UniProtKB/Swiss-Prot annotation:
Name of the featured protein: M-ectatotoxin-Eb2b
Family: Belongs to the ponericin-Q family.
Keywords, alphabetical: Antibiotic, Antimicrobial, Secreted
Lineage, highest ranks first: Eukaryota, Metazoa, Ecdysozoa, Arthropoda, Hexapoda
Keyword Secreted listed: yes
Subcellular location, record wording: Secreted
A GO-annotated cellular component: extracellular region
Tissue spec: Expressed by the venom gland.
GO BP field: defense response to bacterium
Reported function: Antimicrobial peptide active against Gram-negative bacterium E.coli MH1 (MIC=2.5 uM) and P.aeruginosa PAO1 (MIC=10 uM) and against Gram-positive bacterium A.globiformis VKM Ac-1112 (MIC=0.6 uM).
Length: 24
């Protein structure tokens, strides 16, 4: 269960981090 949950959230988190980095 947790593995699937993390796998589902990881991409969203990565996208969010990239967006924050772009905003600087």
């Amino acid at each position: 269960f947790w593995g699937a949950l993390v796998a589902g959230l990881a991409p969203k988190v990565a996208i969010g981090i990239k967006a924050i980095n772009k905003k600087g």
